[in-house]
């Protein structure tokens, strides 16, 4: 897959910054000179939230190909940094939905993301999940010196001290060869064993890619990032925080010019929840009739899906996902056409929504879109939640 014109500009901006970084040996000065060259010195005030570590941000709208941009950024960043024996990437994501999507794509040798990384690193690439790292599965001192090691991890599995988070701090006999090969850590992590996964990654001094980085600006998140001991931090987001060091930005008009916005966005405001419900059902039915009437339908199957956004539990008189399911059934919709997808309930697990054999036409969620869930058949979003955010749904 070739980079779009706006994506080429983003990578060109990154390369220019890296050139300036090599010339100045000062990441803040390089940032200042970069924006000075673009006649925008006011944008060149570097926010040093990670002292000693270059920290840049790509501001790209949702659907603009941030993941592919990150894949294209890995090689230039490593080429610009001082030589190291190991090349490790920590790829941080904010949710399990994005985690599974990213892991699946990066492990798939036929996927454009993996093909790009393979091309840049001579196919000497290994992609790891947290569990694979904990198990020492193809993860050892010899392997990490001979390949690019990409570790796809969730924020919560490293910034929390719950049961899952603690695994990264605990003694791990599977990783003992690392502690022998790497020696005493220069930057020991508090309360982490020398054989702990977190400490081993710390000693590899990885490039850290932070997907949806606006979710990683709390004190706990910054502590997590520092504990990774990164050589470089690259933020990816459509809605950067004010302390982000934006090195390149893309607007929605550029996406439209490159045909990245493939469908019109039509917004309706209804007076009450009943109208939202019935209008969404009617619109979905009309879309399915149109899809079935197309002569090419036999070659390209389409089953339009409504994504209903309900209120979280615990709010009195709110339309929670249980109540919403009951209302849909009361209108005559078969129960097998309805599924719930929340942080606690996932009725979509092991379901192929694109299969003609799948009956699901209505999915009830709370924060699935915010968490990165995606489905090509989900043409309609009907929100019954009381939303006030200006940047998410």
What are these model-predicted stretches?
Residues 1-393:
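RecA-like P-loop NTPase motor core of helicase/translocase proteins
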